[in-house]
Every structure is written in C-alpha cells, then in structure tokens.
C-alpha cells in the first residue's frame, strides 16, 4: 500500500497535507520515507515551506540542514542544537554510523567550506598501500554554533529533551527564505511550569561569515532559571583546540580550532549574546559548565540567570561570526567583526536582508513548475505534487552549499553531503562535476562555477599526480577523492581505478563554457585542463596488436562492484569522446588537430556481445549485478554514437541493465534511466516510472532531503550506511526535466532539444535556462513546447553568442537532427513534442499508461505504474508474497472491448497464482480500500516459469537481451474490458531460503478482440 497521504491529498488554500498525525514512538528506527505517514510533512505552495508536527529526536533524517555556501550545520529535531544519533533498538548497542571512509558516529555536523584536515588514513580505503605516499584529507568540524539552552532546576532544553515533555510541536523550513523554525510546548519533568518555546535560525545569504539565532520563551508562571549561549565542541570532529574563552566586560565568547595535523590553519567561531535585559541578569554571567554543556575541550558557553514572568515572552538572540585562515588572513578579526556587526544591526535587519537575498535566487522563474497555467494549481495527483516539492528542495539544497562567482569563497566544489554533513568525509567526487553541476549550470552558472573552480585550483597538483605516475609532460590525473590538496591517496587513487573522473571534469568544463560563452574564463585554466586530460588519455589508451584497437587495462567503471577490469564501456567511450572534443576545440580555434588522438578516438575497443548488448567490461558474463548507472551513461550524458552505437542499441542496454540494477545502489541512477527512456523509447511511458524512481524511494520526510539508499535500514539495504543529505541525488533529480523532458543537450555548440512530456504530466514550465549566453523561457504541454528568448544583458559572466541576431535551435534525436528553428530576443517559437507514448508496445493493449492504483505495499521503486508502462525495464513488485493487486481505471474515455487474450511478462520473479478481473463498478471495503463490485468476470491464470534464473548458467552463458518470464492466455467466452481491470497475484516461484519478497510484474497486457 502506498502509505502516504498525498495519495488522497486535499488542497486547502495554499497548503497540501502530505502526511497525517504524528506516528507513535517506535521500537525501531523511524521510517522517514515520504511514501509513509510515519513522519508528517505539510507543504505550503505559496511560501515553499515544509512543516512537520512530529518530534523525532536522535535520528539524522529529522534534522534540518542549513548553510550559506561558506559555513553550514545540521540542526537537531528539537531546535538549533547539537545532536547525536542514538540506537533506537538497543541503547547499549552500536552507535549509528556514517558512511565510508569514516564510519564515524552520526551527529549534527558543522563546518566551513574547505576546512580539511590531514591524517594518515581512514577507517575505510580503496588502496591502503598508497598511504605511504600521501596523507588523506578529510573535512574537519568546528564547534556547533547555534545553541541557546534554557535550564530550570535540573531540566535543560536541548536536543535530548524527551518526547514525553514536548507537545504542540511544529518545525519548518522555508525554501524561499532559508529560515528554519521550531515551536512547541515544553513541560519539563520536575518543574511545575510549562513553557511555550520557539527558535529561528539563519545562515546569512548576504554575509557568509554570519549566523543568527532567535529563541523565545513564554512561561505559564513566574519562574527563575538560566539561559546559556553555547559553542558545542562535540561537532568539532577531526579538529583540536587552538584557543577559547569569554571576553571580559561583554557577552562574547569564542572557540578556535585547528584541523587535525594542521596547526597553521585556524577556524574562529565567535558568538555574541544579545539577551532580553528585562529578564536577564547580565551581571550573573559565568562560563557554562556540565551538565548544561558538554565537557568537550573545544566547547565554550556563557550562562546567565533569568527571571521570567507568567505569560510574557522573553527573546534571546545570538550572532555568530565564523571564519578560517583558509580564506581570511586575520580570521579572528573577520569572525569578531561579523558577530559585532550582526549584533549591532539586530535580528530584523539580519533576517530581512537574508530573506531578500534568498528571494532573488528562489524565484518562480528559477524553479520547474508543474501547476496548470490557467488555474495556478497543481493537478490532483500525489506523485506530481511530490515532484513539485522535490524540485524546489533540489535547488535549495544545492544552492545553499555554494557561493557565487566573485565572492572569493567559491573554489571548494560541492561535497556529497554539503556543509552540514561529514558523509564520505566531505570529500569531492565525480558527483559534483557529473551529477550536481549539469542542472545548476543551466540557470545558476555563477554558482555552479564553484565546482569547476575547484578543479582549476588543483590543476597543478593534478599535473604532479600524473608525473608521479610516469605520465608524460602536460598530463593530469585527478584523484578519485579530493580534499585540501588533491593528491593521490588510499581513498582517492589516481591510477588503476576510475579514470573516467578526468573525462567527467573535462565535459563539465566544456558544458559550462557552452552555456556561458565566457571565453576569458575558459581560456584561463579550463581549456588547459581539458588539453592535459587529453594528453593523459592518449597515454592511457594501449594499442592491442591483435584486435587493432585501443584498450584500457586494470580500471574501474562507475559500477564499483566490478574492479580491476579491462575496457569499461563508459570509461573507454568517454576517452574516445574526450579526444574528439579536444580536437574540435583545436579546430574551432584555428589550431592543428592531433592526428594520433583522432585515430585513437575512432578505434577504441568497444566491448559488445554478439547480441548487441554493450558489455560493461571485456569479460562480463550474464550474471552481472550493477551498483549504479554505468553503461546507460553512454546514451546520456555522453551521447556516444561512435562504433555504430545506435538508438536501438541504447534502448536494448536500458532494458538489460535496468534488470541488472542492484536495489542497494545510490539514488542518482534512475534520473539517467528517466532521461534515456524519454529519449529513445519508441512507445510506452517508462520515462515517468523511472522519474518516480529517481525521487520517491530516496526522499525523506519531513524536509525532502535525499538519502543515498532507498531503504535507510542497514539490516535490509545490504549493510550500507547512507550518505545524508545526499546532494548527488538532488543533483541527478534536478536534471530530469531539462535533459529528459525537454531533451536538452549542452555538449554541442548549438542549442539542441528533443521535447516529450510524459502523458501523466499535463503541464510543465521549466526553470529559465541559459545557453550560449542567451536566455530562454520554456513551457511544455502534452503536444507542444513554447520557447521565448529573453535578453541576458547585464547578467554576470554571460556573453550572448547571438547578440543582435537569430539563435538556432536544433530539434530531433541526438545524432539525427530533424529540424532547425531560429529565435530572436523577444520572439516565441512553438516546437511540436514527440508523442511516442501514444504508440502501443504490445499490439492491441488497452491498458498501457492508464491510471493504476494499489492498496498493497510495494518494494522501493517497484511501482504499480511499472506493470502497464509498456516497458520490461520496469516492474511492479509487492513487498511480500501474499495476495496483492493493482486496479487499472479504464473509465476515462474509450469504448469497451471484448477481451481476446492476456499477456504477462513477469520479469524475473513470476507469481504462483494470478487472477484477472473485469468490472464496471467499484466500492470501498471495510478498510476503505476500493474493490470491484457488482458483476465481475474473473479469469484465472496458470503461471509457470519459462525463463528461470540459474546463477551458474548465467555465469557461463553469453550475454543476451533481457526477456523475462512470459505467459500468454487466450480468453474464451464473453469477457469484456469494462471500466476497471484488476490483477491479483500471490506467491512467488523464486521464493526459498527465507526469501518472502513478492513476485514481479514487468508488463500486464489486455488485448481487445478487435486487434
């Protein structure tokens, strides 16, 4: 059953209720999936805010992530406090851990951009022997700066407040303003007074060194207590104390830390308390001590006596300045000035300018919009409402981790979890260049340039890496992971691993140049990097005298389940494309091309099976299990078309590898599947199924942050500790509308689109995008795409290539351009969409892409829609092998047909039993679930596997296209389609050895008698 209230969502004013009442306390870790009602999330479409009424402490998914691109923090469920995760099943058991390579305790992290330490190794690594050549560089924390703690008697209000003491809870994050809030009633045990409390926090979008917090408290009776401004050192992991103290004759405290093993680098955190004089005894100020604050050596706090009055609200503010010597020579002075200036300006001024700055970024024009342009309302569809919320959240979470170009603070790229997370040790992976940058490049190139600037900054080190590994002069090798230096390390090898990172970097540099046309920037670093990567690639490719082709040996493709293989398809195809691109750049600049690179590009060893399936690597068998998107990346973003790699080959690969995808892979994979399906599918609507799979299983309530895994429970997800928040997932999802639905490509000199909007989505207004320095407003409906060009004069870092003249727009399938439109500034053109989804995959099928529902729980990403989307690349799978069903609605148009046959593709897990029912009426049962009613015609189906899986056979067999288990049933008698069709399945032929998972249905087809 799809247990989330958006399925029966009611629009009340501007609010969409996405979940019901607070879930009861659970023995296990709470399931924060948005497809549950365990944790509430209420969306306000006008304010772009999410609000929860459920207080779920000590679990990372419930924390708000806030940052401003320079400093960021994860804030506790109870308020802007530091918080540890706790073991929800056994208080004495193992502490919840973060992901590789640290496997450290989950906590509310806070740091400064680029504040990396050095240390010999981590708890996890890739190549331990590389540790002898250079230390690791992991993100280091700073003291958690946002806490204001109230104490009455022995009771203190911090992140550990017991849920039994909290009522009327409400916490929200507003994406338009970047303001986080908490409000509730606190009834501390042993204290006769109750308190209405609220907190607000901002990380200033205007002043990158400033954090501001407001706390308000209203007692039910006169009461005396204490208030503490704390800088909590427990988040300063991998850092050590430089200095700390309380300033004399003021209300300022500070804590300064060095990242481990770097005494020449110092971060300063300076907090000034501006507490309500009416209720605060300033003369009582003392240094805070346990148990109010932690005993961590970098913790510092200041405590004041307070006397509150019944029913009167007391207000307390703190203004925190943060700076490190990485970017500010006199970091202490910068931090102190930020704190002082914030205090002088006051809360209202700080919030006002912060909100205005976010308002300039999070505009209606900057966000994809699924509302009906005639009514301004979202369609009454739960999934589209989720897509709308997530689209807003994607942009916010990515942008809040970035500073704009020209700030002097934008050269540390974007880590997997951003500035509020230590997941993956805060290191930089291909995630930034390949997954986060493309969507941001389109409408926020000034911000996305931070990703490119990082690679430019570490260019010299990349040249040293290549020289160390005996590559010729002018070559570069970027390490798989990078921190402060970009050297080759145990976690970040430069050779014998994922060479494709270098190509990913180059392709992003080319694409941001194509978008901005900022040639001054491009020729001052990026162009040289791309050339150097070509030199490296030319040395990496090894000529095979037997095959007369170029090979890559001992490497890893994006699928990290397969290491030390030859000729990874994505890497070797990327090598060929990179060499081609570099020669094109040379040709366009009037330079001689490199003939050797041309010959290499045209003669790579492209691993292909006799069945035309692209092999992920040279020796792959039919038993492959893929971690994440790999071969399908050839279709997009690579748009590879050499070696006679056709559109039909790309579709064949999509079907094959979709059925080889591990359920434990990371979140971004299905964004690629959605784009590829919408580009190359000749029929059906699998692109929409993949789109849902790119969002729904990975989004977490209450604040729509991505998790790396579709199931956060390590006992069920292959023992994977998910990265959180997973900005890579946000980045991938942020590409689906422009690159999938619009079919945009930015890897070529002219704007290229191939529009097709899935039939489930009636309207889409895309974010405004830039290309070749020009600006474009774009809207889509079912049949057409409308494009209006606007002037970009005055937009920083953009040079309109077509200023004063018409701009060409190529429309068609990549590699097969079909039409060219031209557009002037202020002009509108109308481009017909591809309506391929109107084509029926199985001739005569009356169910394809109709509305389908189910009241039964399904496996993550295995949606009921998959059973009728016209593709075997997707499948519906109930969570259990008990009786489960789907109900297809045929009542909306069309005439009834006599049914002649039924066809099923069960995928890899056929059920034991199946029944198809036809009827014209439905009614709710005692559980409120819709069931067929009245006259019902039932057709029992005998199911026997005809393509059973055998691991030994698969390992020995040649690689062949995916088919699945099939059943064809002729329907005798007078069975008519009716208004409703129901498929019930039970059992699973694959069950055994404790496997109680449900069967799969890849395609369910009903064929009318007229076909």
Predicted regions and their residues:
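Active-site core of glycosidic bond-cleaving carbohydrate-active enzymes
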Residues: 428-458, 502-507, 511-515, 524, ...
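Extracellular carbohydrate recognition and processing domains
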Residues: 932-973
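Fungal secretory targeting signals
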Residues: 1-24
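Acidic/polar, glycine-enriched structural segments that form the non-catalytic walls/loops
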Residues: 20-424, 815-817, 825, 829-849, ...
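The feature captures the catalytic groove of carbohydrate-active enzymes
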Residues: 418-428, 474-528, 535-599, 785
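Alpha-helical scaffold segments in carbohydrate-active enzymes
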Residues: 392-400, 454-461, 528-540, 581, ...
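Aromatic, loop-rich ligand-recognition surfaces of beta-strand-rich domains
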Residues: 871-932, 965-1011
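Non-catalytic C-terminal accessory modules of carbohydrate-active enzymes
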Residues: 130-190, 196, 684-866
């Amino acid at each position: 059953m799809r247990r989330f209230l958006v399925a029966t969502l009611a629009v009340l004013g501007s609010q969409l209720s996405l979940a019901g009442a607070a879930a009861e306390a659970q023995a296990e870790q709470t399931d924060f999936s948005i497809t549950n009602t365990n944790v509430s999330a209420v969306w306000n479409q006008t304010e772009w805010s999410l609000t929860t009424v459920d207080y779920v402490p000590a679990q990372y998914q419930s924390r708000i992530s806030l940052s401003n691109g320079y400093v960021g923090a994860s804030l506790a469920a109870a308020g802007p406090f530091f918080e540890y995760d706790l073991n929800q099943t056994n208080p004495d058991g193992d502490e919840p851990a973060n992901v590789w390579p640290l496997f450290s305790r989950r906590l509310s992290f806070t740091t400064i951009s680029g504040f990396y330490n050095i240390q010999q190794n981590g708890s996890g690594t890739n190549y331990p022997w590389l540790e002898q050549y250079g230390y690791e560089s992991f993100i280091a924390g700073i003291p958690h700066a946002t806490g204001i703690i109230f104490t009455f008697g022995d009771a203190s209000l911090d992140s550990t407040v017991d849920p039994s003491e909290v009522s009327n809870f409400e916490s929200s994050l507003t994406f338009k303003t970047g303001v986080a809030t908490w409000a509730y009633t606190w009834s501390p045990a042993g204290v006769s007074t109750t308190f209405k409390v609220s907190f607000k926090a901002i990380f200033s979008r205007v002043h990158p060194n400033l954090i501001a917090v407001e706390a308000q408290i209203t007692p039910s009776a006169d009461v005396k207590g204490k208030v503490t401004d704390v800088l909590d050192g427990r988040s300063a992991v991998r850092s050590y104390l430089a200095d700390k103290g309380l300033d004399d004759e003021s209300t300022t405290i500070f804590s300064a830390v060095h990242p481990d093993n770097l005494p020449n680098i110092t971060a300063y955190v300076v907090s000034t308390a501006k507490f309500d004089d009416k209720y605060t005894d300033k003369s009582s100020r003392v240094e805070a001590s346990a148990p109010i604050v932690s005993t961590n050596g970098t913790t510092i706090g200041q405590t004041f006596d307070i006397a509150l009055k019944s029913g009167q609200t007391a207000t307390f503010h703190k203004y925190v300045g943060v700076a490190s010597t990485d970017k500010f020579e006199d970091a202490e002075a910068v931090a102190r000035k930020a704190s002082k200036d914030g205090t002088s300006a006051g809360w209202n001024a700080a919030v006002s300018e912060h909100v205005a700055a976010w308002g300039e970024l999070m505009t209606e024009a900057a966000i994809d919009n699924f509302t009906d342009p005639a009514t301004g309302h979202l369609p009454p569809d739960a999934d589209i409402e989720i897509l709308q919320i997530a689209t807003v959240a994607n942009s916010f979470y990515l942008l809040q981790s970035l500073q704009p170009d020209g700030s002097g603070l934008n050269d540390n790229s974007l880590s997997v979890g951003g500035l509020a997370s230590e997941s993956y040790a805060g290191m930089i992976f291909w995630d930034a260049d390949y997954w986060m940058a493309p969507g941001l490049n389109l409408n926020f190139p000034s911000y996305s340039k931070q990703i490119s600037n990082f690679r430019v900054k570490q260019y010299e080190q990349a040249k040293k890496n290549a020289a160390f590994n005996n590559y010729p002069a002018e070559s570069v090798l970027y390490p798989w992971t990078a921190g402060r230096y970009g050297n080759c390390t145990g976690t970040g090898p430069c050779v014998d691993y994922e060479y494709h990172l270098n190509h990913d970097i180059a392709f992003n540099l080319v694409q941001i140049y194509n978008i901005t046309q900022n040639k001054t920037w491009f020729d001052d670093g990026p162009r040289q990097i791309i050339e150097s990567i070509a030199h490296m690639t030319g040395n990496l490719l090894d000529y095979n005298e037997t095959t007369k082709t170029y090979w890559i040996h001992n490497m890893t493709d994006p699928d990290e389940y397969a290491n030390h293989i030859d000729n990874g398809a994505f890497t070797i195809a990327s090598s060929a494309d990179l060499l081609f691109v570099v020669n094109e750049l040379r040709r366009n600049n009037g330079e001689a091309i490199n003939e050797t690179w041309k010959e290499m590009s045209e003669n790579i060893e492209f691993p292909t099976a006799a069945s035309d399936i692209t092999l992920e690597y040279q020796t792959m068998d039919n038993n492959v299990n893929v971690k994440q998107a790999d071969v399908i990346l050839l279709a997009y973003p690579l748009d590879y078309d050499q070696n006679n790699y056709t559109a039909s080959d790309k579709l064949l690969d999509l079907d094959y590898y979709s059925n080889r995808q591990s359920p434990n892979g990371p979140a971004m994979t299905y964004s690629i599947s959605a784009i590829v399906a919408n580009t190359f599918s000749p029929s059906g609507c699998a692109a929409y199924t993949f789109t849902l799979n790119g969002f729904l299983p990975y989004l977490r309530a209450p604040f729509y942050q991505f998790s790396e895994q579709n199931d956060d429970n390590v006992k069920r997800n292959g023992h994977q500790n998910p990265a959180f928040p997973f900005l890579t997932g946000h980045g991938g999802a942020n590409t689906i509308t422009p690159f999938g639905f619009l079919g945009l490509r930015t890897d070529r000199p002219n704007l290229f689109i191939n529009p097709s909007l899935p039939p489930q989505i009636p309207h889409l207004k895309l974010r405004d995008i830039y290309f070749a320095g020009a600006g474009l407003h774009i809207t889509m409906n079912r049949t057409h795409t409308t494009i209006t060009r606007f002037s970009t004069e005055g937009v920083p870092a953009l040079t309109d290539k077509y200023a004063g003249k018409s701009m060409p727009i190529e429309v068609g399938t990549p590699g097969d351009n079909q039409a060219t439109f031209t557009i002037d500034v202020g002009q509108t053109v109308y481009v017909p969409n591809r309506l391929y989804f109107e084509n029926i995959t199985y001739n005569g099928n009356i169910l394809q892409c109709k509305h389908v529902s189910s009241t039964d729980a399904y496996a993550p990403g295995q949606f009921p829609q998959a059973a009728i989307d016209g593709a075997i690349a997707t499948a519906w799978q109930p969570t259990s092998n008990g009786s489960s069903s789907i109900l297809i609605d045929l009542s909306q148009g069309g005439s009834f047909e006599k049914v002649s046959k039924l066809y099923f593709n069960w995928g890899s897990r056929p059920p034991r039993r199946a029944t198809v029912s036809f009827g014209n009426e439905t009614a709710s049962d005692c559980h409120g679930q819709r069931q067929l009613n009245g006259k019902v015609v039932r057709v029992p189906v005998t199911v026997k596997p005809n393509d059973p899986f055998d691991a030994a056979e698969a390992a020995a067999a040649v690689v062949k296209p995916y088919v699945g288990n099939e059943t064809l049933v002729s329907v005798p008698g007078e069975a008519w389609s009716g208004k409703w069709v129901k498929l019930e399945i039970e059992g699973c032929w694959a069950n055994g050895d404790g496997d109680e998972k449900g069967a799969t249905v890849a395609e369910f087809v009903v064929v009318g008698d007229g076909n």
